[in-house]
Amino acid sequence: MLDNKDIATPSRTRALLDKYGFNFKKSLGQNFLIDVNIINNIIDASDIDAQTGVIEIGPGIGSLTEQLARHAKRVLAFEIDQRLIPVLNDTLSPYDNVTVINEDILKANIKEAVENHLQDCEKIMVVANLPYYITTPILLNLMQQDIPIDGYVVMMQKEVGERLNAEVGSKAYGSLSIVVQYYTETSKVLTVPKSVFMPPPNVDSIVVKLMQRTEPLVTVDNEEAFFKLAKAAFAQRRKTINNNYQNYFKDGKQHKEVILQWLEQAGIDPRRRGETLSIQDFAKLYEEKKKFPQLEN
């Protein structure tokens, strides 16, 4: 069993890896945090307290997990790599408020796990250094399930984080921005250098905060259909929405006039590009489309 010193230092991380003969798997995007200051910034941004339940994805050797355990009521961590379970049993042995589930977060029954382990928590936050290769599927999977999550403070590839937080009209703004901002209010916490990881990743990192909205930003009757319609506007970013929707709809080329009429009734200039349309603009398009049964996809 380890003593109560912080895990997130180069020397202690290396000692743990040597003790267990652990080798990093590139395919799992394993990069462990070795800077306690960064972890403290993440904890501070999370606003967790003794009544908070935390979901962590990819705890690794427990560098962030131990700090979460010191601040939160309970921590529920999902770790896909079986080789790390003995390490976590060691590093987290001082804490009786942590449950580690050895399962792929994209295949796990998260709702059931939350009901079993975090049911007595007043607030639930997702706090994690996410595996960069599956950041987007993880976030969308959590947001689109009926799980009572209040917010997320998550580390990810800088480029992806900038897309989540992008403003209308910016180069980074796209369909991912729309989905995430539909569900949450987004903000940047801090940029993280490569040097605070072992091994250093190939990309720069960012921590973002996403707080769940009490109500989605706009009201639509079918979220999946709404997101598909919005995504189609970005199919070819250099093309106008008129061109993109002609390619998106079945027989769109034969319905050019109908598409123009639809855009006009929604108050959207057909010469605009997808990146200039707000979520509210896409909601107008979605509602107006119901008046044009010819526009199928």
Curated annotation (Swiss-Prot):
Q: Which CDD domains match?
A: AdoMet_MTases (cd02440)
Q: Is Glycoprotein given among the entry's keywords?
A: no
Its chief place of residence is cytoplasm
Reaction(s) the record says it catalyses? adenosine(1518)/adenosine(1519) in 16S rRNA + 4 S-adenosyl-L-methionine = N(6)-dimethyladenosine(1518)/N(6)-dimethyladenosine(1519) in 16S rRNA + 4 S-adenosyl-L-homocysteine + 4 H(+)
The answer to keyword Isomerase applying to this record is no
Q: Where in the cell is it found?
A: Cytoplasm
Supply one GO CC term from the record.
cytosol
What Enzyme Commission number does this protein have?
2.1.1.182
Q: Which PROSITE patterns match?
A: RRNA_A_DIMETH, SAM_RNA_A_N6_MT
Which enzyme type, at the first EC level? transferase
Write the protein's name: Ribosomal RNA small subunit methyltransferase A
Which species is this UniProt entry from? Staphylococcus aureus (strain Newman)
